[in-house]
């Protein structure tokens, strides 16, 4: 009998609750201005949101049937959403305590997102390489004689590159530009003391706090940069030695062999990326995840123009053996943005009835981006193959558009001659098909074609 898999080892559907999505601010921001906007006259944090509605958020997770969820306890802005004793740059209410308690009541595995790579807490102003953009690397790995210049230059170039990627994403996906904020706002270089040790001590003190005080199921660290940056390696050693049972992952680690992590993860922001990456990682032997925004982008809160896109992304990734996680933005009063939340809720209701078809299945071991011996006449429909029990499952997923006619699927008899019966899941509705000397032809009536994922169970002789 196969060993029962733990939640992080199986395909699954997750949510990451975002706290960084703020009207009037981009992912890249000028922290001289941002931090000033968040301070009172004594330079203490004047917190104005999001006022996290933790009970509502956990209840949302429960209602839509997520398999796990994540909360951003400290993003790149450095604001801590928990009662830490190592800084006053923290929220008046201990949101993490409520999140942990409510997650346990709901029996939802919960993780903490923690930005290890950037932290714009003003208590680090003296050692902050760049204060006028988000990328600012404390722990860049370099022994170059002009180390401080290299750190600032690399951080600045990274901010430019990220801006180009955000712009291309907006152009290709055709969502409107947010004109209320600029990517760069009065950028400048400022003097700083090169002292990564101060930040590292702070970070490890907080990780110890988070694990011992709130006892999460896992830590989701942002992010991993191969050998360019030190913090990830030190976190691996720290967690392996002190807290090996706490699930650990690093953003952007999926193409690397980490010396200590429970699963790997990276980002996929649209259905095309999910399709390409899902096929790329489908044959991975270790657990993996891909994450993307539930809305248009991390800093754009409008719902995706295609209301089925996030659902199709999730189906692709889970059918490929991975976990699909979506960042959910909240308004300043803590209310989840209705558009993205509605799209995920719709998928959640669909997923509840089909959860076992994903979680208890194993991807077929084939090369390429289509199941051998299966052809679909509709060009926008792709297929993924799994094994569920003793039966092949074929997932038929529209990358674009909606069903407008009957869907014709052809099975080559050389590969599928033993095919005896085809059932439409989860209804177990038997579908008729025809055979000739070379092919088996299945015509799925338009009304039976699912807008998210049409799942066929093949019964073999």
Which functions belong to the PLM regions below?
Residues 2-461:
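Mature catalytic domains of secreted/periplasmic carbohydrate-active enzymes
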